[in-house]
Amino acid sequence: LLFPLSALPLDGDQPADQPAERMQDISPEQNFWFDLVERGCCTIWNCVQLPGCPCC
């Protein structure tokens, strides 16, 4: 690269360009994984059925 990536203008439509909105998107009401953690998704069967579960 001949120029740093930080020199590129942001177009505003990417999540990284909107940190305030990005922080609002991780509320328990909107995120599927929060409810699973509260209910205890750490059984082997849930980990098999839900690959990528954060508590597995």
Curated annotation (Swiss-Prot):
Location, primary (coarse class): secreted
Propeptide boundaries: 9-40
Keyword list, A-Z: Disulfide bond, Secreted, Signal, Toxin
A GO CC term attached to the entry: extracellular region
Cysteine-cysteine disulfides: C41-C55, C42-C53, C47-C56
Ranges for region Disordered: 1-22
Location of this chain's protein in the cell: Secreted
Source species, domain of life: Eukaryota
GO molecular function: ion channel inhibitor activity; toxin activity
Note on domains (UniProt): The cysteine framework is III (CC-C-C-CC).
Protein name as annotated: Conotoxin reg3.9
Organism: Conus regius (Crown cone)
